[in-house]
Amino acid sequence: MIFPIRCFSCGNVISEVYEEYRTRLKNGENPEEILNDLEIKKYCCRRMFASHRLDNDRELFDDIVEYK
């Protein structure tokens, strides 16, 4: 679905770095290094990035909207 604004567990704002994460991931960088550079330290916040589906630069939300 749509990337959450805050971490579900701790409530930290994580959406502010999502676009940079997505761009760097698309360029082939290692997800661990990206999260370290963006200073996403907590496991719960890192989980939010790792578990968010990105397939061919499309999010799950893009697929669902087609079936309105």
From Swiss-Prot:
Cofactor (UniProt): Zn(2+)
Subcellular location: Cytoplasm
Catalytic activity reported: RNA(n) + a ribonucleoside 5'-triphosphate = RNA(n+1) + diphosphate
Highest taxon above the source species: Archaea
GO molecular function: DNA binding; DNA-directed RNA polymerase activity; zinc ion binding
Keywords: Cytoplasm, DNA-directed RNA polymerase, Metal-binding, Nucleotidyltransferase, Transcription, Transferase, Zinc
Cofactor binding note: Binds 1 zinc ion.
Protein EC: 2.7.7.6
Record function comment: DNA-dependent RNA polymerase (RNAP) catalyzes the transcription of DNA into RNA using the four ribonucleoside triphosphates as substrates.
Subunit details: Part of the RNA polymerase complex.
PANTHER family for this protein: DNA-DIRECTED RNA POLYMERASES I, II, AND III SUBUNIT RPABC5, DNA-DIRECTED RNA POLYMERASES I, II, AND III SUBUNIT RPABC5 FAMILY MEMBER
Protein name: DNA-directed RNA polymerase subunit Rpo10
Organism: Methanococcus maripaludis (strain DSM 14266 / JCM 13030 / NBRC 101832 / S2 / LL)
